[in-house]
From Swiss-Prot:
Substrate binds at R99, R109, R138, D228. Pfam families: Iso_dh. Its EC number is 1.1.1.85. InterPro entries: IsoCit/isopropylmalate_DH_CS (IPR019818), IsoPropMal-DH-like_dom (IPR024084), Isopropylmalate_DH (IPR004429). Binds 1 Mg(2+) or Mn(2+) ion per subunit. It comes from Buchnera aphidicola subsp. Uroleucon obscurum. This is 3-isopropylmalate dehydrogenase. Keywords: Amino-acid biosynthesis, Branched-chain amino acid biosynthesis, Cytoplasm, Leucine biosynthesis, Magnesium, Manganese, Metal-binding, NAD, Oxidoreductase, Plasmid. It comes from the Bacteria. Mg(2+) binds at D228, D252, D256. Pathway: Amino-acid biosynthesis; L-leucine biosynthesis; L-leucine from 3-methyl-2-oxobutanoate: step 3/4. One of its GO terms (biological process) is L-leucine biosynthetic process. Its cofactor is Mg(2+); Mn(2+). The record marks Y145, K196 as: Important for catalysis.
Length: 364
């Protein structure tokens, strides 16, 4: 096990720098109180990088990430850069190249409802009464978003058409399936694979390989759902699911659905991993430029993203559990930021960071 870690910190735009400051408080505690040894180096990314260095992903930033064991990412984008050509906007010109460069093929999106925040869910109270804790695993580098040929054409009779190609290679499905089963072993030992194998050849291959991989994990129960049924079942009874294994397009849809039924995207972290478990860890929400600089953003998603880095990037489950426990502790005590408060008595961004940090120090 590594004893020295290097973390590249990329705060980015909008609320990114604000919530990242609260993650720094947790990093300081990990170093001083838990005696973890790591080096932290901060780099520009996104719109601020365009403004200061001319590129959304400067070479210096990419090189710094290459020398690191993990990337802790904030958020990118904002109205200032919305009139740029789409390929040059921070969201496209920073995050997608990072995913491609490091071959981050697996996106992990936890969707958990806390008992203290059940009232925020758009689902009926009897559905969320028992809570839910779903881990959506989305294949991130294959499928219809990357398949070729893809384009638009104009026929001689002036009829325009567009086309995309859904392609999956066996090795792409194999590696994401193994990861899903391995993660399920540390949870509730259930994997539900999402496909459309009654129509799509790519889904038939997906289902066949997932079934084959499942034989290596006899302690994990495997089920299959068509994407249309899965979307309905998540609304009807989310508590029946543990790990959802999804192709790229279906995972894009499912992970957002799982996020919205929790009631606040400001609570949700994510991780994108490659085969060596190198990862990029970031909040599931965006840069929220409308509230940037107001000190009202919820830092919990950024702190929980750091927890995922500790869990998967450092393989320190016990310490990650303590970070998660500190977040739960402050919620149980009634501390809220504006987005999860039902009144005007809420904490500022820095105040929420402080109470979580104090809970981590005290072991609450």
């Amino acid at each position: 096990m590594k004893t020295q870690y290097r973390i590249a910190v990329l705060p980015g735009d909008g609320i990114g720098p604000e919530v990242m400051r609260e993650a720094y408080k947790i990093l300081k505690i990990l170093k001083n109180n838990f005696l973890l040894s790591f080096e932290i180096e901060e780099f520009n990314v996104g719109g601020i990088a365009i403004d200061q260095e001319g590129l959304a992903l400067p070479k210096k930033t990419l090189l710094g990430c290459e020398k690191s064991d993990a990337i802790l990412f904030g958020s990118v984008g904002g109205k200032k850069w919305d009139n740029f050509p789409i390929e040059e906007r921070p969201e496209r010109a920073a995050l997608l190249p990072l995913r491609k460069h490091f071959n981050l093929f697996a996106n992990l999106r936890p969707a958990k409802i806390y008992s203290e925040l059940k009232h925020l869910s758009p689902l009926r109270s009897n559905i969320v009464r028992d809570g839910f804790d779903i881990l959506c695993i989305r294949e991130l580098t294959g499928g219809i978003y990357f398949g070729q040929p893809s384009g638009r054409r104009l026929e001689k009779n002036n009829i325009e058409y567009a086309f995309d190609t859904e392609i999956y290679y066996d090795y792409e499905i194999n590696r994401i399936a193994h990861l899903a089963f391995q993660l399920a072993q540390s949870r509730s030992h259930k994997v539900c694979s999402i496909d459309k194998s009654n129509v799509l050849n790519s889904s038939i291959l997906w289902k066949e390989i997932v079934q084959k991989v499942s034989k290596n994990y006899p302690d994990v129960d495997l089920s299959h759902l068509y994407i249309d049924n899965a979307i309905m079942q998540i609304i009807k009874n989310p508590n029946q699911f543990d790990v959802l294994l999804c192709p790229n397009l279906f995972g894009d849809i499912i992970s957002d659905e799982c996020a919205i039924i929790t009631g606040s995207i400001g609570m949700l972290p994510s991780a994108s991993l490659n085969e060596k478990k190198f990862g990029l860890y970031e909040p599931a929400g965006g840069s929220a430029p409308d509230i940037a600089g107001k000190n009202i953003a919820n830092p919990i998603a950024q702190i929980l993203s750091l927890s995922m880095l500790v869990r998967y990037g450092m393989n320190l489950k016990d310490i990650a559990d303590k970070i998660d426990k500190s977040v739960l502790s402050v919620l149980k005590k009634g501390y809220r930021t504006a987005d999860i408060s039902n009144n005007n008595n809420y904490l500022k961004t820095n105040e929420m960071g402080d109470v979580i940090a104090n809970a981590l120090i005290s072991g609450e």
